């Protein structure tokens, strides 16, 4: 298959393919074909234009990143954008959706956004929970889920030594949360 509409194969004679590329679908470039200085398109990349990114190894060299998709093309190719992460197999790290703190979703994993618990570590606490809550490697949507937070925050009326163990149920109002049960919790 020719590269981006260039005749004569995919060697040095191919030249620039720029606007001739026309897209990154399977009809554009095969994975092993690349026209300098244009970034090769692999079928998994859904960008409308490859643009110039200096790669010369079919989307898997300095151009394509470890996954051979859009990689280090710069964050504007492949439908993810520099922030949105709608196709996060391509970009890492991703940006958090509104309502999630900047410390969320800064790991090597990149799923659509903070609303997915498997994306973020650590996560931000929801309103009403202290900053010491949800600072572990586990991240469920937020403090309202007891399996997220360790240690958890005590509700008003419970002493500070209550609920400071690895167990965390929603709060001190549940006596099964506190080890030891240091106060008279209303249940």
Swiss-Prot record:
9 X 4 AA repeats of C-C-X-P: annotated span: 28-180
The organism's place on the tree of life at top rank: Eukaryota
Sequence repeats by residue range: 28-31, 34-37, 40-43, 109-112, 119-122, 138-141, 148-151, 167-170, 177-180
One GO cellular component, as annotated: cytosol
Family according to the record: Belongs to the KRTAP type 5 family.
Cited function: In the hair cortex, hair keratin intermediate filaments are embedded in an interfilamentous matrix, consisting of hair keratin-associated protein (KRTAP), which are essential for the formation of a rigid and resistant hair shaft through their extensive disulfide bond cross-linking with abundant cysteine residues of hair keratins. The matrix proteins include the high-sulfur and high-glycine-tyrosine keratins.
Protein name as annotated: Keratin-associated protein 5-8
Source organism of this protein record: Homo sapiens
Phylogenetic classification of the source organism: Eukaryota, Metazoa, Chordata, Craniata, Vertebrata
